[in-house]
Amino acid sequence: MGLLSVLTLVLTVPIWRRTPITGTGLSFAGLGQAGGLRLLALALLNSLPVAITSTLFLFFVEDRLQLPDKAGPLLILFFLSAGASVPLWAKLSNRIGPKQTLLIAMPLSIAGFIGAASLSAGNLAGFAVICLASGAALGADMVVLPAMFSVVLTRAGLNASAAFGIWSFARKLGLALAAFFTLPLLERSGFTPGQTNSAQALTTLNLAYAVLPCILKVGAFGMVLTLPTEVTRK
């Protein structure tokens, strides 16, 4: 995650050089009226798939795909794809709008989850392609959703610093929820990392890593579909 943070910082320097808008005091009522709470709910739901896969990535690669010592290179590939895609998604968002950009990016992630669920053990090339696609999709989440939230705050004249503190909390909550629900689920199935596991345990891992995030991502995609286009444009 540190590598991804550095890449994001470097690639989004022009965005953070803009003059900050402090706005007026922040309240949940004000956020709700501006549409900010809706975007916060979307951010939380949309953070869950990547939070789950981040939590279970090592288990999936080494135990489900049986690719020991390949998790590190695959994770780097995922991060590089995410970081490299950020400026491309930013340009596309400026051209066609944030909502339409997300509607293009999210199916990439959904396709990646479907592909991961159907991979056979030892399929390194197939999972590498999935890491590239899902990393690129994450790049859109990193740049487009915060930009949409910023537009809402600016139009409503709300305090950006306080609001983005709540935004950051929502994403961290997603990570906590991912670990809270998936790790006990694997434990109950009898899954043990680095050991010979039963078919049931590996199926549970497959469902937790690929199928559940896919369902959550489809839900987030549905939420994006309901967003008014005019609200998401600068």
Predicted regions and their residues:
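Residue-level signature of mid-helix packing/kink "hotspots" within the transmembrane helices
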Residues: F79-P87, A176
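Intracellular loop-helix junctions on the cytosolic face of multi-pass helical membrane proteins
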Residues: M1-L58, E62-L67, L205-K234
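Hydrophobic core of transmembrane alpha-helices in multi-pass small-molecule transporters
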Residues: A125-M142, M148
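Loop-to-transmembrane helix entry
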Residues: F57, D63-S81, G126, Q200-A208
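C-terminal ends and interior cores of transmembrane alpha-helices
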Residues: P107-G122
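Cytoplasmic membrane-interface "Motif A"-like loop-to-helix N-cap segments
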Residues: N94-L108, A156-G157
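Loop-to-transmembrane helix entry/capping segments in MFS-fold secondary transporters
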Residues: P68-D69, R155-A170
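Helix-to-loop junctions at the C-terminal end of transmembrane segments
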Residues: A84-P98
